[in-house]
Amino acid sequence: MHQLYYNAARKAIYMTGKAITTNAPSTSNGTTVGSSLQATAFKNMSTQEFVNAVGPIAREDYRKTGVLASVTLAQAINESGWGKSGLTQSSNNMFGMKTSLSGNSWSGSAWDGKSYAEVKTTEEYNGKKVIITAKFRKYSSVAQSIADHSAYLSNAMNGTHRRYNGLTTTKSYSTQLSILQKGGYCTWSGYVSELTTLIKKYNLTSWDN
């Protein structure tokens, strides 16, 4: 099972479990391209097929939010294991978004506020790994997951300041990745390097045009 490295609250999450209970998802809205795409479609896709399926959604989202499509794609690849992780397959959750993030005080969330999947995960606290059951957001489509993730990156607060301030005003993927790292998105030191490699290897910047 793919390991997902994600930091929603300044702690690393290593997700290897699968959903054990779920609530029904809401209907997706606000995204037209690929709005009905389900993560189950990724199960037998090649890497290029995955990029071709998610790319148009990421590009449209970039035009709306300023979060580069290349960054969205690289994060989705890294955090969902090319869409094949247990959480992604069961819940269309491409980024390991928990039900509670930054106090849920940020605007523009595409999540319905109630649909979730309970997943067993291994989290790291002060260098020690523990297994817990956590609640993760469940989405009606891949597009809804991407929209919610971009809203979080655009509007999440850290006190009185935006957690990822300046992210949506730069068109440099390296700068966006640096802002994510500085904002505490992921505590794994190799995160930016890993995403940079994915962007270059699969020519993900082509979706930023």
Task: Mark where each language-model region is.
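Catalytic cores of secreted/periplasmic lytic hydrolases that degrade extracellular macromolecules
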Residues: 2-209
